């Protein structure tokens, strides 16, 4: 079930605060975050985030097509190793 439109998108308070501060200073340094649940908003376009995947931080550069998705969607947590090939 999706989030109610009445509530608006969820973005962690500390994360949006950092983005707004960087927009005012016109800085584009990477923002390190553990908040995979935060939704990408239009004011985040052009910023680089380092999103934690449970083991390490993966770099995510936000573009226009990512708006409306969550940060965690671009930082996979599982590694798929192919199924073994049967010889014979």
From Swiss-Prot:
HAMAP family: Ribosomal_uS19. PANTHER family: RIBOSOMAL PROTEIN S19P FAMILY MEMBER, SMALL RIBOSOMAL SUBUNIT PROTEIN US19M. The gene is rpsS. Keywords: Ribonucleoprotein, Ribosomal protein, RNA-binding, rRNA-binding. It comes from Chlamydia caviae (strain ATCC VR-813 / DSM 19441 / 03DC25 / GPIC). GO terms for biological process: ribosomal small subunit assembly; translation. Belongs to the universal ribosomal protein uS19 family. GO terms for molecular function: rRNA binding; structural constituent of ribosome. Protein S19 forms a complex with S13 that binds strongly to the 16S ribosomal RNA. Pfam families: Ribosomal_S19. It comes from the Bacteria. One of its GO terms (cellular component) is cytoplasm. This is Small ribosomal subunit protein uS19.
